[in-house]
Each structure stands twice: as C-alpha cells, then as structure tokens.
C-alpha cells in the first residue's frame, strides 16, 4: 500500500463529499414553484453529481482493496440506516407502510434503495478483478476500453440522446467508468496534451 500522502486529492475528496451533502440538504429545502428555486436546485444537483463522480474517480486513483471484514461492516451500516430511516418515515413522519417499502428497507443493496451504495457495493465486489484487468491491459488497450465505454455510456446518451442504460448516469456503468479512469490516471498519469 502506498504510504505517500496526497493532500491535494484528499482535499478534493472532502470537497466532493461537501458537494454531495449540499446537494441532498439544499435540494430537499427549496421546493417551491419559483423558477429561480428550480434553477438553483438544478445547479446544486449538478455540483452534487460532479461530487459523486470525483469521489469515485479518486477511489479509482487510490484503488479499492477488497477486505471481507470491511465489506460486511459496510453492509451492516447500510442495512442499519435503511431500517432506521424506514422506521422514522413510518412512525414519526406517518408515511404509509407498504410491503414493498419494507422489503426495500430490508434489502437496500439489492433493491437499489440507495443507488450510490448499491453501485459502490457492486464496485467493491468487482474491484479485485477490475484492478487485475487494468494492470494486465496495455496502455493502448486501456485507452480503447475507456474510449468505447465513454462513447456508448457518456457521449451517446448526452449528445445523441441514445441511452443504452436507462439510469441517467446514476448506475454501475458510470461508476465503473469513473473508477477505471481513476486507475488509468494513477497508472499512466495525465495525457501529455492535458498537462
């Protein structure tokens, strides 16, 4: 494990977390019909989603090292908060109880109740294989993989409105792409024309 401190990347990770938290707090605060509030929410959501991509990109740069104990600890934490949030919603906020809602809360990863945690858990499970894959590809093959992935899952839906995966960018496809880009940057650095 690399013991070198990367204070710039650590700071960027903190900024990405702040953007994500701001999106969730402010995005749920301004819900009037005012067009200015709608534009503000759109702006905050854009920043927050950028924060998600940055967070995964940095995770890719450092690489996820699978650890069974940490994996199960993460699952327990997600499950705990899922159950607690369900109880708060049904008991204190008087949200009607549904069997679907209960099942979703009992199986938050499989039901994709929290899209990011579902994606992160899947990425965490596949990380040993992704890490091995990228270290066995030549730089040229790695670039081709990223370009193909980017074309079909970023460029085509954004510019051509041709969406293969209907997840509006909030799914395992884009999370994996950001992770792979982070791994590429760690291995090969920035391309010369971007320095």
Protein language model regions, located:
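Alpha-helical transmembrane segments and their membrane-interface exit regions
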Residues: 175-184
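Membrane-interface transmembrane helices that cradle and orient dolichyl/undecaprenyl
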Residues: 185-189
């Amino acid at each position: 494990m690399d013991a070198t401190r990367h204070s710039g990347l650590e700071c960027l990770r903190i900024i990405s977390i702040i953007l994500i938290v701001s999106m969730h707090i402010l995005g749920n605060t301004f819900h009037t019909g005012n067009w200015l509030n709608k534009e503000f929410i759109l702006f905050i959501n854009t920043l927050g989603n950028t924060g998600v991509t940055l967070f995964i990109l940095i995770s890719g740069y450092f690489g996820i090292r699978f650890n069974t104990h940490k994996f199960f600890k993460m699952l327990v934490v997600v499950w705990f908060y899922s159950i607690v949030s369900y109880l708060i919603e049904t008991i204190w906020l008087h949200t009607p109880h549904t069997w679907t809602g209960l099942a979703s809360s009992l199986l938050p990863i499989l039901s994709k109740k929290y899209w990011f945690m579902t994606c992160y858990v899947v990425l965490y499970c596949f990380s040993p294989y992704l890490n091995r894959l990228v270290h066995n590809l030549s730089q040229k093959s790695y670039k081709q993989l990223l370009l193909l992935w980017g074309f079909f899952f970023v460029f085509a839906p954004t510019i051509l409105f041709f969406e293969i995966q209907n997840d509006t960018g909030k799914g395992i496809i884009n999370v994996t792409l950001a992770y792979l880009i982070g791994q590429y940057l760690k291995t090969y650095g920035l391309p010369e024309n971007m320095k």
